[in-house]
């Protein structure tokens, strides 16, 4: 009900048809809409994991995605309603995307590989124009050292693996 209610809160009319989609970090659903929807028969709704990203980081990512879409890169940008792409319903943050079919490229096919490489190059060229202010930086300190310390300090590892993990990760991170 929460999923359907959140879509109704932004003016969409779901039929009740709902399928959970695979996602590593967030909760993502395909939702069927009433026939009169301007977004087609289905949308994909992404609910962001609490406390993982700030609103500013999500909106910055959405703005970048919209910029890429305006430059005709092959991607799906979030739907904008009332001048925003990030919505909140009962303390759940979410974005809505048009559903778009596709398929994985055949990386053994030279032409597919070249198209993918050119597309990634274009994305990086657009992203290099400005500094992203709100997205956490990828760093050995944040993703390596801090994670290592957290696991060791909070006894998350089986006792018999702790010494080996400590030694190995110290060697890898230094």
Report each predicted region and the residues it spans.
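Conserved beta-strand edge residues that scaffold enzyme active sites
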Residues: 21, 82-83, 134-137
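Short, conserved active-site entrance elements at the starts or edges of catalytic domains
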Residues: 161-174
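ATP-binding glycine-rich phosphate-binding loop
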Residues: 10-32
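Short, non-transmembrane alpha-helical segments in secretory-pathway proteins
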Residues: 1-13
């Amino acid at each position: 009900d929460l999923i359907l209610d959140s879509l109704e809160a932004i003016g969409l009319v779901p039929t009740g048809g709902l399928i959970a989609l695979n996602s590593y970090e967030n909760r993502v659903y395909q939702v069927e809409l009433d026939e009169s929807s301007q977004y087609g028969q289905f949308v994909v709704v992404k609910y962001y994991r609490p406390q993982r990203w700030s609103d500013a980081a999500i909106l910055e990512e959405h703005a970048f995605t919209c910029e890429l879409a305006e430059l005709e890169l092959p991607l799906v940008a979030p739907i904008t309603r009332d001048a925003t792409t990030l919505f909140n319903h009962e303390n759940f943050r979410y974005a809505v995307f048009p559903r778009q079919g596709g398929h994985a490229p055949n990386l053994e096919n030279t032409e597919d590989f070249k198209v993918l490489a050119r597309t990634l190059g274009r994305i990086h060229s657009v992203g290099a124009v400005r500094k992203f202010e709100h997205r956490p930086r990828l760093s050995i300190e944040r993703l390596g050292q801090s994670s290592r310390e957290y696991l060791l300090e909070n006894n998350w590892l089986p006792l018999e693996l702790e010494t080996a993990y400590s030694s190995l990760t110290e060697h890898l991170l230094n």
